[in-house]
């Protein structure tokens, strides 16, 4: 009976759009890609998607530091991320962004359904506020001591030591991560998702087999502690989606981030005519939905996400596949040691297949951390891929090419041995299917040892010197190449670049189902080097370059600050001499004879000043400035100009021309007030 192809949708966690992809990120994307490639080899219909997580205060603040719009920053970051994933041959069908119309519509739809179904609650909360920056502080911008385990230097929403979640107000001795100031408590109305209403459903789902045992056990601890309502809104200023019918309130990034899976798939469906969004996301969908994620975001994916889907009438994930962290040389990745390696830096020095293989050899279905030991990395890749697999082809291909014009023998030299190799496919397939790629690699390398032992025993280099044994030589070498073909078929999900070169050499596609039929009387192409041995010097150069990346990141910041550095330090007495006041622009008009100046009539609350300001290009319709409050230097000596006397200076930011921005105070300021 022919097995019916499965419909599968696979996602990876969305990389945050405020930084580069590093080798820690790549573990997840490689793991998922290996699993996806295996499923595709077995004939299943797999759609593999991802997107950038592009909202939140960190992105807003970083864009401000760079002097660019958040949209500009996330667009550049998306391009870099996609280039890195392509360099590692991650076979995404679609890569999108949470800052998209698809995601805006779906976020609004899900929120609307949750609200209509009674799962959204409104209440006024006390929230930490940075008095220096004039903004409410989101969870990740408050740091302090965990209220559960008392670990220091933890974020305001969850503890990286014990995994607990809490509100920022529970944090002990909080500090603003933006300014370092001690936050103040202020009140604000927020919207909450009623997570406790889904407790029974979530507990049943937890034990349904949808989660690894380690994850299910951790979730039970959260259930025992009691689920809390989840704050899903943030106050302006915030870069994200404004909540419908709630001006100044924005969806918290963790609400629209997982919806980004749906948004990316919707974008793919709109591009193609053969995909139906509802077939994969409707309540009774028969498609499989798998999320590959790291253990640091289990809470959001195992509680909030399935509850949101359930409450809004969509299907829940079939399974969450959770992995551990990456360490390098037994320690946390370090910029100072050069082990915080960006994906782009790696690709400048080494073949992507090398890291894919090393990760595959270490991965299992458990949530264990993976150590990238750089010396072991070099030794294992060279020993396994070069010495065992590729060497098997090179030892035999030369004879086939030179002595037999690239033609393989018409029968197998050892049919029983070949059957041993193809029979092993069932166990290797089961390992891949269950995400036990480490076990699959061990079984494949055991076969590689057998294949090389066969060649050693048959010694084709000796047979080649014996007159009249051409048929034996062709049979031995053809057997070696057929065994190489089976090995590379099993390695195809792991080594896509080497697979492509192998298929060119063998003159055939590597197919799992095809290996039961050996290549007999088959024409292969002239052998070319398939894989280069890793040179330890290249690894050292990569580490050194990563140290240089850190120095560059520390010393070169793009944006206004880099273009116009801070001036020499002045003392407080010098600064105190400058008297800045709030001024009301009563009249603003063009200056005849000047293409740069505007004449401003300013009210200082009892005194009127005339100021000439070079802001005409930025404000071509000066009447729009009238009635606006601004800041002026009130004690600047009057300056006689061709058009009249200027009695001060208004304050503005920007490089000049059209890019200049008049400063305005917050509401409540009055003309004449001193700016301190």
Swiss-Prot record:
Subcellular location: Cytoplasm
GO annotation, cellular component aspect: cytosol
Annotated ranges, domain tRNA-binding: 574-676
SUPFAM superfamilies according to UniProt: Anticodon-binding domain of a subclass of class I aminoacyl-tRNA synthetases, Methionyl-tRNA synthetase (MetRS), Zn-domain, Nucleic acid-binding proteins, Nucleotidylyl transferase
The enzyme's E.C. designation: 6.1.1.10
GO biological process: methionyl-tRNA aminoacylation
Location of the motif 'HIGH' region: 15-25
Cofactor: binding details: Binds 1 zinc ion per subunit.
Superkingdom in the source lineage: Bacteria
Cofactors, names only: Zn(2+)
Binding site for Zn(2+): 146, 149, 159, 162
Disulfide pattern: none
Catalytic activity from the UniProt record: tRNA(Met) + L-methionine + ATP = L-methionyl-tRNA(Met) + AMP + diphosphate
Record's keyword terms, sorted: Aminoacyl-tRNA synthetase, ATP-binding, Cytoplasm, Ligase, Metal-binding, Nucleotide-binding, Protein biosynthesis, RNA-binding, tRNA-binding, Zinc
Main location, first listed in the record: cytoplasm
Record has Cytoplasm as a keyword: yes
Function statement: Is required not only for elongation of protein synthesis but also for the initiation of all mRNA translation through initiator tRNA(fMet) aminoacylation.
Family affiliation: Belongs to the class-I aminoacyl-tRNA synthetase family. MetG type 1 subfamily.
Protein known as: Methionine--tRNA ligase
Annotated source species: Pectobacterium atrosepticum (strain SCRI 1043 / ATCC BAA-672)
């Amino acid at each position: 009976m022919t097995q019916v192809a499965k419909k599968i949708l696979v996602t990876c966690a969305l990389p945050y759009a405020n930084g580069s992809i590093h080798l820690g990120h790549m573990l997840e994307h490689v793991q998922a890609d290996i699993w996806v490639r295996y499923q595709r080899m077995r004939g299943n219909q797999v759609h593999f998607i991802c997107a950038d997580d592009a909202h939140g205060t960190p992105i807003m603040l970083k864009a401000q530091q760079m002097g660019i719009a958040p949209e500009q920053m996330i667009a550049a970051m998306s391009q870099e991320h996609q280039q890195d994933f392509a360099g590692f041959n991650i076979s995404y069908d679609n890569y999108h962004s949470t800052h998209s119309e698809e995601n805006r519509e779906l976020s609004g739809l899900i929120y609307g359904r949750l609200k209509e179904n009674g799962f959204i609650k409104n209440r006024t909360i006390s929230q930490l506020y940075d008095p220096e920056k004039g903004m409410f502080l989101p969870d990740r911008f408050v740091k302090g001591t965990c209220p559960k385990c008392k670990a220091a230097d933890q974020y305001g929403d969850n503890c990286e030591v014990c995994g607990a979640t809490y509100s920022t107000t529970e944090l002990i001795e909080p500090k603003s991560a933006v300014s370092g100031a001690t936050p103040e408590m202020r009140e604000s109305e927020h919207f909450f998702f009623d997570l406790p209403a889904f407790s029974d459903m979530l507990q049943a789902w937890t034990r349904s087999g949808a989660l690894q045992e380690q994850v299910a056990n951790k979730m039970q601890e959260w259930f025992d502690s009691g689920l809390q309502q989840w704050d899903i809104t943030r106050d302006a200023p915030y870069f994200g989606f404004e909540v419908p019918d709630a001006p100044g309130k924005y969806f918290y990034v963790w609400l629209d981030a997982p919806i980004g899976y749906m948004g990316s798939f919707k974008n793919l469906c709109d591009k193609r005519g053969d995909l139906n969004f509802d077939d994969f996301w409707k309540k009774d969908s028969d498609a499989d939905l798998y999320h590959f994620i790291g253990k640091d975001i289990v809470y959001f994916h195992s509680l909030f996400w399935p509850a949101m889907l359930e409450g809004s009438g969509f299907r829940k994930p079939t399974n969450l596949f959770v992995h551990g962290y990456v360490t390098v040389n037994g320690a946390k990745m370090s910029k100072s040691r050069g082990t915080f390696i960006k994906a782009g830096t790696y690709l400048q020095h080494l073949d992507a297949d090398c890291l894919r293989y090393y990760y595959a050899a270490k991965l299992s279905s458990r949530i264990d951390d993976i150590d990238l030991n750089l010396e072991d990395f070099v030794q294992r890749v060279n020993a396994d891929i070069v010495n065992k697999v590729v060497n098997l082809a090179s030892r035999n291909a030369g004879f086939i090419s030179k002595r037999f014009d690239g033609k393989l023998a018409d029968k197998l030299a050892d049919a029983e041995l070949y059957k041993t190799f193809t029979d092993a496919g069932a166990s290797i397939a089961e390992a891949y299917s269950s995400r036990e790629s480490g076990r699959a690699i061990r079984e494949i390398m055991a076969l590689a040892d057998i294949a090389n032992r066969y060649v050693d025993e048959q010694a084709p280099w000796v047979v080649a010197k014996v007159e009249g044994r051409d048929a034996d030589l062709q049979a031995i070498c053809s057997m070696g190449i057929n065994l190489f073909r089976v090995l590379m078929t099993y390695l195809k999900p792991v080594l896509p670049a080497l697979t492509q070169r192998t298929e060119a050499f063998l003159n055939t596609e590597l197919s799992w189902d095809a290996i039961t039929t050996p290549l007999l009387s088959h024409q292969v192409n002239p052998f070319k080097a398939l894989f280069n041995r890793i040179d330890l010097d290249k690894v050292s150069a990569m580490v050194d370059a990563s140290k240089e990346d850190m120095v560059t990141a520390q010393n070169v910041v793009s944006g206004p600050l880099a273009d116009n550095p801070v001036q020499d330090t002045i003392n407080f007495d010098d600064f105190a001499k400058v008297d800045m006041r709030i001024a009301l622009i009563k009249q603003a008009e063009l200056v005849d004879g000047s293409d740069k100046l505007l004449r401003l009539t300013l009210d200082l609350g009892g005194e009127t000043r005339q100021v000439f300001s070079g802001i005409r290009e930025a404000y071509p319709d000066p009447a729009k400035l009238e009635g606006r409050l601004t800041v002026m230097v009130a004690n600047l000596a009057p300056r006689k100009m061709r058009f009249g006397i200027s009695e001060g200076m208004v304050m503005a930011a920007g490089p000049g021309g059209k890019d200049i921005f008049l400063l305005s105070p917050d509401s409540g300021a009055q003309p004449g007030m001193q700016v301190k």
